């Protein structure tokens, strides 16, 4: 099966390290530098740059590889100071305006560093590379960190340490926006760790820094030594008043119906992410076209800047596996690998492919093609592979040795096998597997699980799995399964967002996506959410946000928790489908149902006998995502799109390809929505009995503070007394009460009604409790927290020496409001509710003789008839009887000392508190 090992020392293309970088050879296959000429004796003459340390068997060689023009320090000048690049400042187009790009002023020791200014928003970006390449893998060692400094807006962090903490979610999302368009432009085989740091140094609140940060990173990479293929740039497109605006301001985006971010090169689109209000596919393509034109203009300017001021690229650092290794792997595993890729079950297929990979590695190792132990990145001791040399020995070709020259020993040439590292074998095996998978799709029109290109996996969904959850759904599509759970709460459950503006922002709806390692049958880390989890959760959240009711129609904070139980591709879109059904199961009145689908693409290249046309795949699996050329997620209903995200793994795509993918995705969404309608058991469409109850009341805005109290004492006492969960009060007078049962909700309502009502003369209050006594009368609670004075003369129709002669604390009586003074103090009367006959009879009684003082005093304790009539005249009669209708009249707040028991009126009228002028206090 295997051909004989080659006599060649190495098979890879000779590699040269870049300017001003000294490297050490660490691989047996790494070539020596040979001079262009050979000695007359036919031996290879070593270049003077190849330094041999030690000789003979068991010795090892260390070769310092430096460019010939690096013998003199290029970074030094005559005075010993470092020679840094000159300060460069240019303007380049950025949508409908220009941005200022500066380099050479800051971060001069980095591979490249730029500051990009838009208005008064400034983003600084630096690029640095490791001197030593990391171990080869199928993942580019690119690390992006984006941070918004509080000092950019003249603020300081509110934390104890007064410095920026861990990366916030929206910063993670911008990190992903920077990372995703850069990766496709990086060449395979480049393993030097690359770090991109991007900081917002100044923010004017008008020009958003996200698209600016992506463009800044594209400029920095173009100027650096990173061997990227093309420069990239990013823009944001909004739809305002029916017109597409490139890079709109923050205020303009508040009115936009579209939030589209696009990044690419001067010829192709690399990344798209956006959210809209059921935007038709045709308008979405128009927006992409507008954004692509803006990106193209920016990228052309960046390319010109890079050619003039950029550093030489590290093309010589690219290390690819030897071409012969592909041939060996195909010979050993081609047929078996093709059969393994046709296994429908993901786990069974993965185990079969893994077993075959180990088999190939074992065979190559036994044949002597694989190095047993490779410590990539360390200096390796190795015998000289060409020959053993001593200082007193001269090596001459065999047949030219004189018998008398005993000190000269001919050394025959031995064939040296071609050696591969274990990492190279695994990389090549994976690439061969990917090509075979793509070949099956292109040539046979069938995918690994037997589906056609536009076929969607079987779908099953169930609602109401979790009895105590407010809403739950298990959504299954093929081997991808998501458990979506909805929790309802009040504003205190809202997610607080810390931003540069410093304004308190709360998210009423948020989706949290979790991808545990068990979902793919692996053992892994469990901890804080990864960048991938944050990104996928945000995409699903924005897809569902459009269908939610307004806060006025549904005053709940909504949390959706999507846990991926099983994954084989498109788990974020499964979260959209499961989340939509879970919202309906929780009783959230959504506007419509939405679904999500992930689209893929495989090029029908000449390698497979094709013409280079794209093949669009619907509902891709994990293997198709990893081996394909595109991952395009689209969510929406039958008519429009709510969220979309596209990542390209090749040089980019055109608008025609995107249009084809959108049309196919629309058909797929309709099919998924039809399957979701078959959910069994279906969503309940009503609130769970375990969901909290929320009552909304309106009070006068001026009375909100009195309900809250000093330091929140009053509202806390209301919560404690009534037993509700929470009370939220807004500046406009809206009061939201949340409770788990109706009884506590009614108690809180009664308390707030009492505190917020405005009493009017003539109002009658039944069953009121006497709270305390004084020599001059009794204090009666007419509503929770509201008391009035019933003077001793108004407690009874008969004369009383003291209030205790008629009542005691705790007794309940009916009273009538007869006066409200200028301080808001209430004067009540029991006597005013007594029948007229008792009052008249009592007024005709004679006073005791000889007690003139008592007579005068008692006269003062009676209500003056004319005064009572004037009070009664202020009230309007109801047509059906003699009860008075409540007047909506504000009373200003009054305070008094504890000695005279002054009452306070701290709130406004509650229209539901009184009926026909009466309020029953239970």
Swiss-Prot record:
Domain of life of the organism encoding this protein: Eukaryota
Ordered alphabetically, the record's keywords are: Chloroplast, Exonuclease, Hydrolase, mRNA processing, Nuclease, Nucleotidyltransferase, Plastid, RNA-binding, rRNA processing, Transferase, Transit peptide, tRNA processing
Residues of the KH domain:
692-752
What are the EC numbers?
A: 2.7.7.8
PANTHER family noted in UniProt: POLYRIBONUCLEOTIDE NUCLEOTIDYLTRANSFERASE (PTHR11252), POLYRIBONUCLEOTIDE NUCLEOTIDYLTRANSFERASE 1, MITOCHONDRIAL (PTHR11252:SF0)
Function of this protein? Involved in the metabolism of all major classes of plastid RNAs. Required for efficient 3'-end processing of mRNAs and 3'-end maturation of rRNA transcripts, but is not sufficient to mediate their degradation. Mediates tRNA degradation. May function as a poly(A) mRNA 3'-5' degrading phosphorylase. May be required for plastid ribosome assembly and non-coding RNA biogenesis and accumulation. Seems not required for efficient translation.
Q: Which reaction does it catalyse?
A: RNA(n+1) + phosphate = RNA(n) + a ribonucleoside 5'-diphosphate
Ranges of Low complexity composition bias in the record: 904-913
Name of the protein this chain belongs to: Polyribonucleotide nucleotidyltransferase 1, chloroplastic
Q: What is the effect of changing residue 202 to N?
A: No effect on activity or DNA binding
Please tell me where this protein is predominantly located. Answer: plastid
**Localization terms from the record:** Plastid, Chloroplast
Question: In what residue span(s) does the S1 motif domain sit?
Answer: 762-831
Query: Could you tell me which InterPro entries the record lists for this protein?
Result: ExoRNase_PH_dom1, ExoRNase_PH_dom2, ExoRNase_PH_dom2_sf, KH_dom, KH_dom_type_1, KH_dom_type_1_sf, NA-bd_OB-fold, PNPase
Q: What happens when the gene is disrupted?
A: Delayed greening and retarded growth.
**SMART domains per the UniProt record, alphabetical:** KH, S1
An MF annotation (GO) of this entry:
mRNA binding
GO CC annotation: chloroplast; chloroplast stroma; cytosol
Q: What is an annotated GO biological process for this record, any one?
A: RNA catabolic process
Q: Where is this region: Disordered?
A: 833-922
SUPFAM superfamilies membership? Eukaryotic type KH-domain (KH-domain type I), Nucleic acid-binding proteins, Polynucleotide phosphorylase/guanosine pentaphosphate synthase (PNPase/GPSI), domain 3, Ribonuclease PH domain 2-like, Ribosomal protein S5 domain 2-like
> Which residues are the transit peptide here?
1-48
Query: What is the species of this protein?
Result: Arabidopsis thaliana
Give the record's family classification: Belongs to the polyribonucleotide nucleotidyltransferase family.
């Amino acid at each position: 099966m295997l051909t004989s090992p080659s006599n060649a020392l190495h098979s890879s293309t000779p590699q040269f390290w870049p300017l001003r970088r000294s490297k050490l050879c660490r691989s047996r296959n790494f070539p020596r530098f040979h001079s262009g000429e050979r000695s007359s004796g036919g031996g290879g003459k070593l270049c003077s740059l190849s330094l041999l340390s030690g000789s003979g068997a068991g010795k090892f060689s260390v070769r310092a590889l430096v460019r010939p023009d690096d013998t003199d320090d290029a970074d030094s000048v005559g005075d010993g100071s470092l020679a840094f690049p000159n300060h460069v400042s240019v303007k380049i187009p950025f949508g409908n305006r220009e941005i200022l790009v500066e380099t050479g002023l800051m971060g001069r020791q980095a591979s490249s560093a730029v500051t990009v200014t838009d208005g008064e928003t400034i983003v600084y970006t630096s690029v640095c590379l490791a001197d030593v390449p990391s171990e080869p893998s199928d993942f580019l060692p690119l690390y992006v960190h984006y941070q918004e400094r509080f000092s950019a807006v003249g603020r300081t962090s509110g934390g104890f340490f007064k410095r920026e903490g861990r990366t916030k979610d929206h910063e993670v999302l911008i990190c992903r926006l920077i990372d995703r368009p850069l990766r496709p432009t990086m060449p395979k085989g480049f393993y030097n760790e690359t770090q991109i740091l991007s900081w917002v140094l100044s923010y004017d609140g008008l020009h958003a820094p996200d698209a600016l940060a992506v463009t800044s990173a594209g400029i920095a990479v173009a100027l650096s030594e990173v061997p990227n293929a093309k420069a990239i740039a990013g823009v944001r497109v909004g739809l305002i008043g029916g017109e597409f605006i490139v890079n709109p301001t923050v205020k303009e985006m508040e009115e936009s119906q579209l939030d589209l971010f696009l990044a690419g090169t001067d010829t192709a689109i690399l990344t798209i992410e956006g959210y809209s209000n059921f935007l038709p596919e045709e308008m979405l393509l128009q927006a992409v076209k507008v954004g692509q034109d803006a990106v193209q203009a920016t990228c052309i300017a960046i390319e010109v800047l890079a050619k003039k001021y950029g550093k030489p690229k590290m093309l010589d650092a690219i290390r690819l596996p030897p071409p012969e290794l592909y041939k060996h792997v195909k010979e050993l595993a081609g047929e078996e690998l093709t059969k393994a890729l046709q296994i429908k079950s993901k786990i069974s297929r993965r185990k079969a492919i893994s077993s075959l990979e180990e088999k190939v590695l074992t065979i190559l190792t036994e044949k002597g093609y694989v190095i047993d132990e490779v410590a990539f990145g360390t200096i390796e001791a190795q015998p000289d592979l060409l020959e053993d040399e001593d200082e007193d020995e001269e090596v001459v070709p065999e047949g030219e040795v004189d018998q008398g020259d005993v000190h000269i020993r001919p050394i025959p040439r031995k064939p040296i096998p071609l050696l591969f590292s274990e990492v190279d074998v695994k990389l090549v095996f994976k690439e061969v597997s990917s090509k075979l998978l793509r070949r099956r799709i292109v040539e046979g029109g069938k995918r690994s699980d037997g589906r056609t290109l536009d076929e969607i996996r079987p779908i099953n969904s169930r609602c109401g799995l979790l009895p105590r959850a407010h809403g739950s759904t298990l959504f299954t599509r093929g081997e991808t399964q998501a458990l979506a759970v909805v929790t309802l709460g009040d504003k205190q459950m809202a997610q607080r967002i810390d931003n540069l503006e410093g304004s308190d922002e709360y998210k009423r709806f948020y989706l949290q996506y979790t991808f545990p390692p068990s979902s793919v049958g692996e053992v892994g880390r469990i901890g804080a959410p990864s960048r991938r989890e944050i990104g996928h959760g945000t995409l699903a959240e924005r897809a569902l946000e459009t269908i939610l009711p307004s806060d006025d129609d549904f005053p709940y904070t909504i949390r959706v928790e999507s846990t991926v139980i099983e994954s084989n591709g498109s788990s974020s879109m499964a979260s959209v489908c499961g989340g939509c059904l879970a919202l309906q199961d929780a009783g959230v009145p959504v506007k419509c149902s939405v679904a999500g689908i992930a689209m893929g693409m495989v090029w029908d290249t000449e390698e497979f006998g094709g013409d280079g046309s794209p093949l669009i795949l619907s509902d891709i699996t994990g293997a198709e995502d990893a081996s394909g050329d595109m991952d395009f997620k689209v969510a929406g209903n039958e008519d429009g799109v709510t969220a979309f995200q596209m990542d390209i793994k090749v040089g980019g795509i055109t608008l025609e390809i995107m249009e084809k993918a959108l049309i196919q995705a629309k058909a797929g969404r309709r099919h998924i929505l039809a399957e979701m309608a078959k959910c069994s058991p279906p969503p309940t469409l009503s609130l769970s009995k375990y969901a909290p109850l929320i009552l909304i009341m309106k009070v006068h805005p001026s009375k909100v503070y009195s309900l809250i109290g000093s330091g929140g004492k009053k509202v806390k006492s209301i919560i404690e007394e009534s037993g509700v969960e929470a009370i939220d009060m807004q500046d406009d007078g809206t009061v939201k009460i949340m409770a788990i049962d109706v009884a506590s909700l009614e108690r809180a309502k009664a308390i707030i009604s009492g505190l917020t009502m405005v009493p009017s003369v003539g109002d009658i209050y039944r069953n009121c409790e006497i709270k305390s006594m004084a020599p001059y009368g009794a204090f009666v609670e007419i509503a929770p927290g509201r008391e009035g004075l019933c003077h001793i003369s108004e407690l009874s129709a008969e004369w009383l020496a003291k209030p205790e002669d008629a009542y005691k604390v705790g007794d309940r009586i009916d009273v009538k409001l007869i006066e409200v003074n200028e301080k808001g103090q209430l004067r009540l009367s029991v006597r005013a509710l007594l029948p007229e006959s008792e009052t008249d009879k009592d007024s005709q009684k004679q006073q005791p003789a000889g007690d003139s003082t008592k007579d005068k005093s008692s006269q003062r304790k009676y209500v003056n008839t004319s005064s009572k009539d004037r009070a009664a005249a202020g009230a309007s009669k109801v047509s059906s009887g003699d009860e008075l209708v409540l007047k909506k009249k504000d009373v200003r707040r009054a305070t008094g000392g504890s000695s005279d028991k002054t009452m306070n009126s701290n709130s406004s009228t509650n229209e539901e508190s009184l009926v026909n002028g009466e309020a029953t206090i239970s």
